[in-house]
Amino acid sequence: MKRFFLTFIIFFSLVYAYANTIVIQGEIIDKKSGIPLSGVNVSTSNNKAQKTITGLNGSFTLKVESLPVELTINYVGYKTLKYIVNKQNNNTIVIEATVEDLKEVQVNSSLEKNNDILARNIEKNAASISNIVSAKAIELSPDFNVANVIQRISGVTLERTSNGDAQYATLRGMDKRYNYTLVNGIKIPSPDNKNRFIPLDIFPSDMLARLEVTKSLTADMEGDGIGGAINMVMKDAPSVKSFSINTSTGYNSLYIDRQFLSYNKDAVNLKSPFESYSNLYAAKPRDFANGLTKITSNKPAPNFFINSSFGNRIFRKKLGYMVGLSYQNSFRGGDITNYGSSISTSDASNLPVVTGKSDRTFSDQQSRLGVHGKLDYIISEKNKIQWYNAYLDFKNHQIRDTRGVDYSIGYDPSNGNYNVSYSTRFRYTHQNIYNSTVIGDHLLMNSKIKFDWTLAYSKAFNEIPENTTVNTVSTVRNNIENQVSVVTLGGQSVRWEHNTDEDVSGKFNFISTVNLNKGTLEIATGGLYRDKQRANFFNEYDLRPFDDNKAVGQKNNLIKGVDWKDYSEIKFTVYNPYGSTGDPLNYNASEIITAGYLQTKLLKENFQLNTGVRVENTNQGYNLLNPVAGVKNIGEQVYTDVLPSIHLKYLLNENKNLRVSYSRSINRPSFFEIVPYKIINEEFTEMGNPDLKHTVADNFDIRYEIFPKPAEQFLIGIFYKNINNPIETGIVDQGQRSFFTPTNFGIAKNYGLELDITKYFFNFGIKFNYTYTNSSITTSKVYYELNTDPNSSVRNVLKTGSQTRQLNGQAANLANLTFIYKNIKNIIDFQIAAVYTGDKLFAVSRFLNNDTWQSSFVQLDASLEKKVKKATLFIKSNNLLNTPVSLYFKKYNKVNETISGYEKFNNGTLLRKDLNGINIQLGFKFKI
């Protein structure tokens, strides 16, 4: 009874105490900017035990015994404030920085440069429609390169490599060819051997101050971005001395269950025999017998990433510098199931027929090196000059090992009879980009005119030397595999490729501001000149098995275990000793762009009107290094475009905008598309098109924007693009022949909706975006039809028709959801991010209604950080679900049900399934 009575008294006392506790709520903001501050210490003046910390949105809650109560507000870089609270809710407390310039506030402040608040502010005040990812958001995300970062932006889908790495970006359902990439506002060249798009995985994410994606172009921007423009703004010199280092190690789960295959990297010949000697040199077997094809199998070393930066301002803060270094060495790969297919011709059903299955393992060791440095010198209050240099280097050593089963000839699984093929590819890819940019900023005529200029030199390089593939075959009878022998025709191919893309460019802008009644008028004009020179080299040798010591009739029959044990022991003869330097991939290309613009920006109390016109002249040409009879061996295209734009931003109130935009933009043919090449295949000849026209598009946008708090946003918008002369690959009939060639196909339409939401609570935050995209384009295709001529021995004939479909590379539905948790007291940051990509048109087929689709999938990534004094421990993981990426036809053929183990996929025909493993990195960061 006493125990019960005591428990009752304690319980009653607690209830009474709680009932007499008052919970006060408030928000801490910066006096100068009005920005909410997170991590501010709040306590009662007479009882320091009663304390709390403001959350991500600057809010706080605190239990006190009575009102009024005096609070003490402490925050690094700010004056300590005593504040008396008289009410429970809606307490807005303003604190003032201890220094006049908020840029001097130390890193502990939420006003740190390159954070989400700055990113939202840029989006809010931008002249056109854009999305920004800040350096702070990148740092806390699970991403290590720019390609992975950009997938978090609405309207962006990614094209991935065989090892699962994101590489190219598609903006608003427009293929990668329809956007361009900038570094600090300067377009950079491409290392691709045929096209002008940039592989974004070559850029380490830790070098960025922010990533900008502009979706509607203004007149002062280059005009060839129908999808948009990607701008990587690199880190500036800090206002105070700073040093940071970040290192991590990790592993890919793929190699827990299997070995990593590698080869002797030093054995790769960077030059072909043609280049090493002369064009008259006949290559010999000894020129290829260098041990490259000897395979080593083991467990890979852990991944190793490191990046560091150092910067300061010296000479009375006039000279600023920032030097950054990033290096990543990782082991990636893929386990891929691939089904070969053809089109059913015997019954003219045009349904897909599965002809074989191959199991491929990819083993990739890749390294990324990034070095960048930036100097800026403040000559005076009116003059400043900057010099930026960057060198980016990417290397990938890959073995692709394939085992294939033929379903079309000799396939009898019930008796254990079928034919087997083996293929192993040894490939080294090396790409680098160098950029050097000088920028000047000046105020003229008593600061009435702003003048800036830019001079830039950039060079991109790509090489794939001694790309070697070895092919062998065998048979299985009664479930027992017979001896493996080298393929007689095409036993080994060895290929050398390299290309350079070199740019010299300059641009300038004059901006004058005129004060009006209750507003201002900004008038800008400028120009651009770029000279691009591109060189391309390709050479391939065909090696065939031959052992002169064997008996007549057996010299080409080289058997594994008898004549050789590993690939390096196979004896070959060179079938084409002079290589294939006559290949159309040997060409030079040039492009000269001259542009000028006039732009006005009217700013009144509640609206901003940006109008302008840009004129761009293009002179694009090519020169075949090996002349071909009957074609244009030298050609050029010269044209001028007038590109108007108008962007209206109506300010509904301080935190709400309504935007309406129109712009005209273009897309130029890629370098190789206008070269008159011909590549003969079994059924079709691929052909270049010197008469290919450039694409012109009219782009319309409407977006409604709300910025409830400085780091929060709600954006919803629609877009529409009317695309004239879109470039797609299709069938063109010439006489009795059909050619697969890049062609202009009339008019295409592309439209969609984008939604972006960012919301922060006390310790939590949510970022969500969704994009719906649809399009329509009609292109020519071929199909088989039963022959109605009774006198003909041909059962079916090939016809040309047309198909209306969406644009290549487009997914109708995209979504991103990121959940953010921040424990301010214990300095812990956690993120889990999901990316959903709906069914995407992956590749366009020559055949009617037989395009390849990528199935919808979800990728899940996560990151966790814990700060300990000046160091931060972190873990980042990608592809946590090890989500398979599958390709398929939407058609299904019951004939395929006779194949042992083959199943339907999404009521269609499975073509490929990729598994790339889970990547996990553990590391630490240190900043001073």
Question: What are these language model-derived features?
Answer:
Residues 29-33, 41-45, 74-78, 90-139, ...:
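Short, acidic, small-residue-rich periplasmic hinge/interaction motif at the N-terminus
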